[in-house]
Amino acid sequence: KTFELDLVSGVVSKGYNCDESVRPLMFSKVEQISSVDESVYFGGYLLNMGKCPVSIYKRDSTDKWKVVYTFPQDTINHVHTLVSDPYRDCLWIFTGDFDEASAIWKVTDNFKTVERVCCNDQKYRSCVVFALPEGLLYATDSPFSDGFIYLMNPADYSVRAIAPIDGSCIYGCQWKDKYVFSTTVEGDGRNLSKMEFLFGRKRGVGIKNDFVHMYCGNLQDGFKEIYKEKKDRMPFYTFQFGVFKFPAGLNISNSLYFQPIATNKNDLKLMELCE
C-alpha cells in the first residue's frame, strides 16, 4: 500500500492499493510545465522479467490515484523516475532494466504523446535525473557496466560523460547549486539461481568495490567523492543493497542529511555532512 501522512494532524491515511506487486521506487512532483498536469506521480516498480504492462499513476487526492498511461506488454520491466523539465516544457520518464527496456521517454500533451527517444543501452538506465538548462544530468544505474554521470543533450539526444563513478546509482539529491549521487553495492541482477538470489554476495562487474560512495558537484566545478562507507557482510537480495538515501526535494541548508543502509558502520542512522 501507499500511505500519506498529514504533517499537521499527524494522521496516516488508510492507504492506496496499487496493482499486484507494484510499488513506487520514488515519487515525482511534476510542476512548472504546461504540457503535463501538476501533481505527484509515480511509475510502477516491480521485478517483471516478463515485461508485463506497467502503468504511471497520478495523485488526485488523499489515497486516490489514477492511471494516466500504461506501457504495453513487452516494453519495459519497470519505471525508475519521472522528471519535470521546465526548460523544454516536457516530462521525461526513465525506465529499466534490460535491453530495449533501458530507455528514456519524452512526454507531452498530458501523456497523449509518449515518445521513446533513447533505448537499448545501459547508459540510458538511470534513477536519479536533474533537468538543467544544458540538458539532463543523471547517473547510471547498471550493476554490470561501468558507471558514469552523464549529460544528455535534448536537442539530439547525445550523451556526454561528465565523471566516472564506482557503481550503480539509485539515490541522489540536489544540495543548493550542487548535485549529489550515491553508488550502490549490489549483485549483477541477471540469471541468478535461487541460492544466488537468496545468499549471493558477488558484486556486479560495474560495482568496483565494497564501498558505498557519495559524489557531489555540478557542471561548472566537476564532481568529487565526499564520503564513503563499507557494505556490511549480509547478502544483497535477502537483506539490502548498500546505499545512502536522501530526503526528497531541494536542500538549501548548509547540511546534507542522509541515511546509510546495509553498511557496517552507520546502518540506519541519520547522518549529517556540513559545508
Question: Which sequence ranges carry the predicted segments?
Answer:
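A short beta-strand motif characteristic of beta-propeller blades
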Residues: 11-19, 65-72, 113-119, 158-163
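Short loop/turn segments that connect beta-strands within beta-propeller blades
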Residues: 6-10, 60-64, 108-112, 152-156, ...
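Repeated scaffold domains used in trafficking and secretory/extracellular systems
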Residues: 21-33, 75-83, 119-133, 163-178, ...
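Structural motif
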Residues: 1-4, 49-57, 99-106, 144-152, ...
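Short coil/turn segments that connect the beta-strands within blades of beta-propeller domains
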Residues: 37-38, 87-89, 133-135, 176-179, ...
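Blade-level signature of beta-propeller repeat domains, shared across WD40, Kelch, NHL, RCC1
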Residues: 241-275
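Loop/turn-rich, solvent-exposed surfaces of beta-rich toroidal or solenoidal domains
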Residues: 134-147, 163-242
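Residue-level signature of beta-propeller blades and closely related beta-rich strand-turn architectures
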Residues: 44-48, 71, 96-98, 142-143, ...
